[in-house]
Curated annotation (Swiss-Prot):
Assembly notes: Part of the 50S ribosomal subunit.
Entry function: This protein binds to the 23S rRNA, and is important in its secondary structure. It is located near the subunit interface in the base of the L7/L12 stalk, and near the tRNA binding site of the peptidyltransferase center.
Tree of life domain: Bacteria
This protein's UniProt keywords: Ribonucleoprotein, Ribosomal protein, RNA-binding, rRNA-binding
GO cellular component, one term: cytosolic large ribosomal subunit
GO molecular function, one term: structural constituent of ribosome
Protein name, entry field: Large ribosomal subunit protein uL6
HAMAP family given in the database record: Ribosomal_uL6_B (MF_01365_B)
Classification via InterPro entries: Ribosomal_uL6-like, Ribosomal_uL6-like_a/b-dom_sf, Ribosomal_uL6_a/b-dom, Ribosomal_uL6_bac-type, Ribosomal_uL6_CS
Family: Belongs to the universal ribosomal protein uL6 family.
GO biological process: cytoplasmic translation
Matching Pfam families: Ribosomal_L6
């Protein structure tokens, strides 16, 4: 069995999990509700306070799907109970972030400010002008939105300027050496 897939997922108090015959998993919790369609080959069962994922065969594809399915369901359970957040840091002279309503405005050294519209299911917070916190209950969506913000100014290797994840180490290069 898959080392990840064989572990049961514990359902915390206040969380309700339903699985349809078409393998559509719905998880409701204190922070919200998530629904995701899983691969039809996987067998997903709710037993007492646990979710158990089993696979039909020892096929290589089924082994991979087994761990994936279990991880996706676990991410949904964690999302509706605790939520997810990614912190981005703006490094560079004049690089600033601010909220306008629910939308995010970034000054990144371009001739115009970058406007990032609010995405349903994701919330932006700006605790400092050089920090942006992207939070929500869907891990995939939070990561995707954070990556889309980072794309506007990826950190460059010479001075390290740009938008980076909190805790991300930028591989630095040495500049040209003079004579």
């Amino acid at each position: 069995m898959s080392r990840v897939g064989r572990l049961p997922i514990e359902i915390p108090n206040g969380v309700n999990v339903t699985v349809t015959p078409e393998n559509v998993v719905t998880v409701k919790g204190p922070k919200g509700e998530l629904t995701k369609a899983m691969h039809e080959d996987m067998n997903i069962a709710v037993e007492e306070n646990n979710i158990v994922v089993t696979r039909p065969s020892e096929n290589v594809q089924h082994k991979a799907l087994h761990g994936l399915t279990r991880a996706l369901i676990n991410n949904m359970v964690v999302g509706v109970t605790q939520g997810y957040e990614k912190t981005l840091e703006l490094v560079g002279v004049g690089y600033r972030a601010q909220l306008k309503g629910k939308d995010l405005t970034l000054n990144l050294g371009y001739s115009h400010p970058v406007e990032i519209k609010a995405v349903k299911g994701v919330e932006y917070k700006v605790p400092e002008p050089t920090k942006v916190v992207v939070s929500g209950i869907d891990k995939e969506l939070v990561g995707s939105v954070a990556a889309n913000i980072r794309v506007w100014r990826k950190p460059e290797p010479y001075k390290g300027k740009g938008i980076k994840y909190a805790g991300e180490v930028i591989r630095r290069k040495e500049g040209k050496t003079g004579k």
